[in-house]
Amino acid sequence: MRFQATLLASTIYLRFCDVKSEFFILNISEALAISLDATVQSVAATIAGLRYFAMAMTGSSKQEGVLQLTPTDNVLVALKDLRKGEHLTFSGAAYTLATDVPAKHKFATVPLAPGNDVIMYGVLVGKAMRPILQGEVLTPLNLHHQAAPFHEKTMEYSWTPPDVSRWRNTTFRGYHRADGQVGTRNYWLVVPLVFCENRNIAVLRQAFEEELGFAAPQIYRQQVAEFVRLYQAGRSNEIAGHGAVAADARPPAPRVFENVDGIKFLNHEGGCGGTREDSDNLCALIAGYIHHPNVAGATVLSLGCQHSQVAILLEQIKKRDAKFSKPLLVFEQQHSGSELAMMSEAIRKTFVRLMEMNENCRRAPAPLSKLCVGLKCGGSDGFSGISANPAIGHVSDIVAALGGRTILSEFPELCGVEQELIDRSTRREVGDRFIQLMRDYAARAKAVRSGFDMNPSPGNIRDGLVTDAMKSAGAAKKGGTSPVTAVLDYPEYSTEPGLNLQCTPGNDVECVTAQVGAGANVVLFTTGLGTPTGNPVAPVVKISTNSALARRMADIVDFDTGPIIDGEVTIEQMGEAILEKVIAVANGQVRTKAEALGQNDFIPWKRGVSL
């Protein structure tokens, strides 16, 4: 069936209510002309997906209640723990809860028969497995994953960018590289081409970090030393009742090189024994890290006989920068005689390059168009798609409007919102590549008796994300509303300004590793449950979806978007505040919690089997 539709007064809104009253918070009307082939239901779903909701909450929203994301939804989100038998009045309808509904979870607003669609964010997120009562909580026992089908781009997407006049002349002080990229940090990289060199990497780390003032505080080492002291003093009975370790009050050791932010040592389990594709991809990923603007140069250790050959690495570096000019030190153990000789030479040459790096690299002003921001969520909860994700989506829109790049990844967590992203593509071939990569990924998962439907973790489900489509609909909010300008396969490098889609897993560290390998010089990472994830090369800003998490895990959370849920600020206001945080981090004025903890996570994505 073909529909020629002009939608006037397209309404996207949020509604809040408590047991006594109803609060209509925002009603945005705008004209939108569309032309597409679809059923009535898919038209509604596509339109709802094209326009993300915005929040402009008043003091009334601080009252505990429920939330509706779009008017077509047949579920409500609990903002607090609701009890069986409670009576709610919402949008002129009365509800009596048939079950307890924990905060962040959803309940049905209408009775659902087996096979009926469940709609949230205006898109299909699942189907009823059995009869679901009005007011009954949705769980894996009554709802299973179902996502809408998708097809090639059939409509032009019109985007109104946010007003970015206040940032048009804003700069950050970064490290300018010869290829035109600008780094937010200035690191020397030490990396193995194969897992056989991991021990040698660890030896180099021990040799360099402490002496150069880059070692993380050793508070747990101090705790063990205290226990040894008590034991040797005959006071071992005091150990059982010893309190938690205190933060290290001693000042950090002074850095030898003022203009070097650190030496980063990578470890991995790849480079040989798997498919040639995995070895080639590892070389491409490492090439992306060496090419990265936060890296001034690198020391590479190779065994010599592995699949991941030095020649492949050099070829991948040239693909990213034909005029590559950074210092690159390569050592092959099988061609170096003794280990002692190779390691001593590696230390000497690396130290010389660090001296040069310290003399030649200085921060200088750069426009915000030089930012490349990774957009990631992990340890997600039922508030992720309501607070933190749309807030960094607004950051993405601002950066895109300023000519910068953003990267939205985690393809298993874009399941169910594909059509919206396809229709936002700037060119037909961009959308077609996304379709092909999504279908190939889904087929690979099915080939090993898995699927995107198995993506939600036990923690996701406990906190309200019952199906992958439900999780995906909220995860996609990180991409804002700007056009999709490029689609990258792993481990390709990002060059196109605007929103880039990148094929990666949802796995936190594999995804961030890939985003940084694609050029992200800052990563925004939202979490509702809490995760310590960081990266060796790019600062990772951890953003909580709720204030309880920010208070409970203050040692790993950098920014709290809980005030959105509390009705204190809008998504746009929060996004602007996050952007200011990004600028401070990019300037080097602020270290992220992951940086302070030395959370240098690096896991290459291994697509193939071990052989």
Please annotate each region the language model reported.
Residues 56-376, 380-484, 496-513, 519-522, ...:
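Metallocofactor- and cofactor-centric catalytic cores in central/energy metabolism, strongly enriched
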Residues 526-531:
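Short acidic/histidine-rich active-site segments
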Residues 28-31, 122:
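Secretory-pathway ectodomains
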Residues 2-8:
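Extreme N-terminal basic, low-complexity initiation segments
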Residues 45-55:
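Short, Lys/Arg-enriched N-terminal segments with co-localized hydrophobic residues
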